[in-house]
């Protein structure tokens, strides 16, 4: 009955959204109608919904330009990388969930929680402050942020909702961007994620506030990003017995999701962090004429029309303000019969000589020909602009990061942790605090490609200094205090790349650490792309390769807490990773093939071990004697990955597939599912030629494997190490059905997730003992506002 009542509520919400959209479209068509002014002239009501005769809105009855460009920047050099705006209609619902657009992430159940990619080659390297890495859905790195240049002020509002006040999830995202002129732009973004949780002690909230600015002048370019984040996650340690989900009939009572017992209560992970990113450069070069884009031409015409209308209104106002019966004074030229006073100067004999530098117009035909040539030149000038071509750039990039983490617990089950190293709050309470401060400066000099026909590639050289500071608990006898560690690193490197042209692109970057904690580290990265025509279509061949020799990050080497402790700075070796990857895509058949081979030496990871007691009752104690440590595998690990992206289309029917095969040489150290499948079947059509509709369903499926467990005290995923308590996950189809629509730029959807929660083996876990949400209806909308 409860589920039926919620379904009725959701249906009412859907009807309300559709009615609102219909009403807004209907009223928009009624925005203007006739009115008669004091002079008897018939006009239309102003677009701002009033009859004010002094309204000076210069955008009335003219199309507001909606051109928008978005890009990301290279984190080291600040290079502009054009990208698509985040306004895509396709897979819009899936983009709002932290299990990924293609369902490729393992999570700890609720939306916005910690996650880890099942596709190993798509995982990112660990950051200096590892505790925020699992929140990659929420955290936006500087090289992932979308900078914006818009022809008119732009506001985007996105809202997603499911559930009710006890268990629901809400996401609200607002982004504003405006350009002062074609060079200077700024904006801000606010994001609030809140999931109350369908299971006990599972609420999570994130808040982000970001301010960004760009200046893209001829000689000076700058990108600035300031962001602050607050994250608070309630940790429940998973449910005490998986049978509550997989075999609920084995219990005498029926348990709602929020009644299933969990391991932990009153345990929290709190993170606060602040980030500043500034990349700027000074360019030395020259000017040349280039054609304008259609959007730039429209913007110029819009500005010209606005200026003319403003001048016309000013002239009309000038005439209306004159006294009645008295015409306004206007110059009418020289009066008839007027003579010039004084004597006419004598003519110089040299005036009779012909000026050979001037064009002689001696006939009407020649005058018409010159006028036509001038008209053609004026037409060309109207669509041309002057572009600055940089030759050399002086580059500086600054990154500043400030982190604080607090793991707080008021209750811990007896025997849950194996070890205890100190006590701060007394009893079983925990208050472990960690801080990290980082400043990185990169100075570079670049010789840019394309400033002449012989410069086919760009060259860059750079030097980087990085300062890192860490604070965490330490002990001296029985005294607990905050100890501080500092690190300084200096590295140098270079880059050669080719990004212009349509056929061949490549990029080779190398960096070597000269001094500091990370001395002797090495990073070599190479990628290339080749395009060529085949059967009247385009084949794209891309390849990537890298060799990284890096130290494990600070908290792998050293970590102190009340129940977990290690100092391995003298024991861990540098981790070496080598990967070669190829991509082949052919747009005619909608096919893309990705193949990667990777070898890892000294693979460093977290291992987690505990005893799992299960007596089959509601009072089952769950995990006990938990311990987590850092492990390093001495032998080489090899990983093979093959991905097939294949799309089919037959009329309105579309079928998209991503099939991933992975093979690890050591599943005990690096477990991955052998197969991971995402499939999306939907109908794509229009209603009344204005409403775009995608109606269908998608499924995510992966084969059984020993997925990484999750440790709340560390906020990290860790490999299962106790043979007696290991569990396998997988072989459950996660099916979602949806109606995804777009109307005049407004995107909205209705989705029912995990449709098969009561079918099959009911093994809807992606992390051991953390079930995913059951069947839930989601609704969301994204609305753009221009001007």
PLM segments and residue spans:
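Generic low-polarity alpha-helical segments
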Residues: 1-4, 11-15, 24, 28-30, ...
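A generic structural signal for short coil/turn motifs at secondary-structure boundaries
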Residues: 7, 164, 196-200, 515-517, ...
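Intrinsically disordered, low-complexity segments
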Residues: 22, 27-30, 354, 361, ...
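Exposed, low-structure sequence patches enriched in small/polar residues
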Residues: 16, 150-152, 226, 260-334, ...
């Amino acid at each position: 009955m409860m589920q039926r009542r919620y379904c009725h509520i959701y249906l009412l919400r859907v009807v309300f959204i559709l009615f609102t959209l219909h009403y807004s479209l209907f009223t928009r068509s009624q925005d203007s109608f006739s009115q008669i002014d004091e002079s008897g002239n018939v006009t239309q009501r102003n677009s701002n919904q009033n009859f004010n005769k002094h309204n000076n809105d210069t955008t009335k009855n003219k199309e507001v330009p909606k051109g928008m460009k978005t890009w990301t920047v290279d984190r080291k050099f600040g290079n502009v990388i054009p990208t698509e705006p985040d306004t895509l209609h396709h897979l819009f619902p899936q983009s709002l969930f932290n299990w990924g657009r293609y369902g490729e992430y393992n999570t700890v159940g609720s939306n916005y929680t910690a996650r880890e990619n099942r596709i190993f080659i798509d995982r990112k390297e660990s950051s200096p402050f590892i505790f925020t890495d699992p929140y990659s859905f929420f955290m936006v790195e500087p090289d992932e942020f979308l900078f914006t240049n818009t022809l008119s002020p732009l506001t985007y509002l996105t809202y997603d909702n499911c559930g009710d006040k006890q268990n629901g999830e809400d996401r609200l995202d607002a982004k504003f961007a405006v350009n002062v002129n074609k060079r200077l732009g700024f904006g801000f973004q606010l994001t609030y994620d809140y999931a109350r949780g369908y299971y006990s002690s599972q609420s999570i909230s994130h808040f982000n506030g970001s301010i960004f600015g760009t200046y893209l002048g001829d000689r000076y370019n700058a990108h600035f990003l300031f962001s602050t984040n607050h994250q608070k996650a309630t940790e429940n340690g998973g449910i005490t017995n998986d049978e509550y989900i997989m075999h609920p009939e084995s219990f005498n009572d029926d348990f709602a999701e929020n009644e299933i017992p969990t391991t932990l209560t009153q345990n929290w992970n709190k993170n606060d962090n602040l980030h500043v990113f500034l990349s700027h450069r000074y360019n030395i070069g020259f000017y040349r004429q280039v054609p304008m884009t259609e959007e730039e031409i429209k913007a110029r015409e819009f500005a010209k029309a606005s200026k003319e209308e403003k001048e016309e209104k000013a002239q009309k106002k000038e005439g209306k303000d004159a006294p009645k019966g008295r015409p306004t004074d206007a110059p009418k030229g020289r009066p008839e019969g007027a003579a010039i006073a004084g004597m006419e100067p004598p003519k110089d004999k040299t005036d009779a000589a012909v000026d050979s530098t001037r064009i002689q117009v001696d006939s009407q035909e020649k005058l018409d020909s010159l006028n036509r040539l001038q008209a053609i030149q004026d037409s060309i000038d109207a669509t041309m602009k002057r572009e600055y071509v940089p030759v050399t750039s002086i580059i500086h990039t600054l990154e500043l990061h400030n982190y604080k983490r607090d793991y707080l617990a008021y209750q811990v089950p007896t025997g849950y942790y194996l070890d205890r190293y100190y006590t701060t709050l007394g009893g079983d309470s925990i208050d472990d605090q960690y801080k990290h401060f980082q400043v990185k400066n990169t100075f570079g000099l670049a010789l840019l490609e394309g400033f002449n026909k012989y410069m086919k590639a760009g060259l860059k050289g750079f030097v980087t200094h990085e300062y890192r500071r860490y604070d965490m608990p330490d002990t001296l006898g029985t005294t607990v205090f905050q100890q501080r560690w500092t690190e300084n690193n200096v590295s140098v490197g270079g880059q050669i790349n080719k990004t212009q042209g349509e056929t061949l692109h490549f990029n080779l970057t190398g960096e070597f650490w000269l001094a500091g904690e990370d001395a002797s580290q090495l990073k070599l990265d190479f990628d290339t792309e080749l395009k060529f025509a085949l059967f009247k279509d385009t084949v794209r061949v891309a390849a990537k390769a890298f060799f990284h020799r890096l130290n494990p990050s600070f908290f792998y080497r050293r970590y102190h807490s009340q129940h977990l402790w290690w100092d391995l700075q003298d024991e861990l070796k540098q981790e070496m990773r080598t990967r070669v990857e190829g991509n082949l895509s052919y747009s005619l058949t909608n096919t893309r093939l990705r193949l990667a081979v990777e070898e890892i030496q000294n693979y460093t990871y977290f291992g987690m071990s505990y005893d799992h007691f299960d007596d089959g009752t509601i009072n089952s104690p769950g995990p006990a004697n938990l311990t987590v440590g850092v492990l390093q595998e001495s032998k080489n690990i090899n990983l093979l990955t093959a991905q097939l992206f294949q799309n089919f289309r037959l009329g309105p029917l579309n079928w998209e597939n991503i099939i991933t095969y992975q093979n690890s040489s050591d599943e005990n150290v690096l477990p991955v599912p052998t197969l991971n499948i995402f499939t999306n079947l939907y109908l794509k059509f229009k209603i009344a030629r204005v409403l775009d509709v995608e109606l269908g369903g998608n499924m995510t499926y992966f084969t059984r494997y020993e997925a990484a467990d999750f440790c709340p005290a560390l906020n990290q995923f860790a490999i299962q190490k106790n043979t007696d308590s290991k569990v396998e996950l997988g072989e459950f189809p996660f099916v979602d059905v949806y109606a995804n629509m777009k109307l005049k730029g407004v995107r909205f959807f209705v989705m029912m997730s995990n449709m098969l929660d009561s079918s099959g083996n009911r093994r809807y876990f992606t992390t051991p003992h953390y079930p995913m949400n059951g069947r839930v209806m989601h609704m969301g909308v994204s609305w753009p506002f221009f001007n």
